[in-house]
Design a protein with these regions (language model features):
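Aromatic-glycine-rich donor-binding/catalytic loop that engages nucleotide-sugar donors
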Residues: 60-71, 155-156
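Extracytoplasmic/secreted envelope proteins and their assembly/folding machinery
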Residues: 7-10, 14-17, 59, 75, ...
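Short, solvent-exposed loop/beta-turn-alpha elements that line the ligand-binding surface or hinge
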Residues: 19-29, 71, 97, 101-104, ...
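Extracytoplasmic/periplasmic solute-binding protein
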Residues: 44-48, 53, 79-132
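Alpha-to-beta junction loops
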Residues: 1-2, 92, 175-177
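Glycine-centered hinge/linker elements that transmit conformational signals in sensory
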Residues: 82-83, 128-163
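Short helix-initiation/N-cap motifs at beta->coil->alpha
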Residues: 73-77, 161-175
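Hinge/lid segment of periplasmic solute-binding proteins
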Residues: 3-53, 109, 115
Length: 177
């Protein structure tokens, strides 16, 4: 068994993938939405996990800062809450966001997962089904806005982006910081 997780993976490794059509494992799937098929329609990879996009929230800390999830309904309300929490981080004992960084252990959060959001919507709107040579950047302003919000309202200063690590972020979240 090996992972073939996207259309490019199927192009690269499709010759090694068996046709799973009609197999017991495929019959156990509750949705076919995440399966990968080749040009003939043969199922070559099944969706065994699903990564969703969003912000992981410590609801207890959010409440300690005086907010409920229902208070945050769009980017403007997220920004207002994050900036308020960041301004009071010293008194609260935690910051709006865990450390933001671009070292090898954490850059995937921002250069991969976060970047997937504007790309998903651009590709959806443009009907893109394969890796394009270029992007239009239709949603990059949204990416910049959330990236700026993260780096300006986290426990690591924007000047420490090259040294803040994923381990720091995980430790902060895990210890309620």
């Amino acid at each position: 068994l090996f992972q073939c997780g996207n259309a490019q993976g199927l192009l690269d490794w499709g010759d090694y993938c068996l046709d799973l059509t009609g197999t017991d494992v495929l019959g156990e799937m509750t949705t076919s939405d995440f399966n990968l098929t080749d040009e003939t329609g043969a199922v070559k990879a099944i969706g065994y996990c699903y990564e969703a996009f969003g912000i992981i929230v410590n609801k207890a800390l959010l409440a300690k800062a005086g907010y409920e999830l229902s208070d945050i309904t769009n980017f403007a309300t997220l920004k207002a809450a994050a900036e308020d929490i960041h301004a009071r981080a010293g008194d609260l004992g935690f910051d709006a966001f865990a450390s933001s960084g671009l070292d090898g252990s954490s850059s995937w959060r921002f250069s991969g997962h976060l970047a997937n959001m504007p790309l998903y919507y651009e590709f959806r709107d443009d009907g893109v089904t394969e890796q394009p040579e270029t992007i239009t950047g239709a949603y990059l302003d949204n990416y910049r806005a959330i990236w700026d919000l993260y780096i300006n309202n986290s426990s690591a200063s924007p000047t420490s982006l090259t040294t803040a690590t994923g381990d720091m972020s995980q430790a902060e979240f895990g210890t309620g910081k």
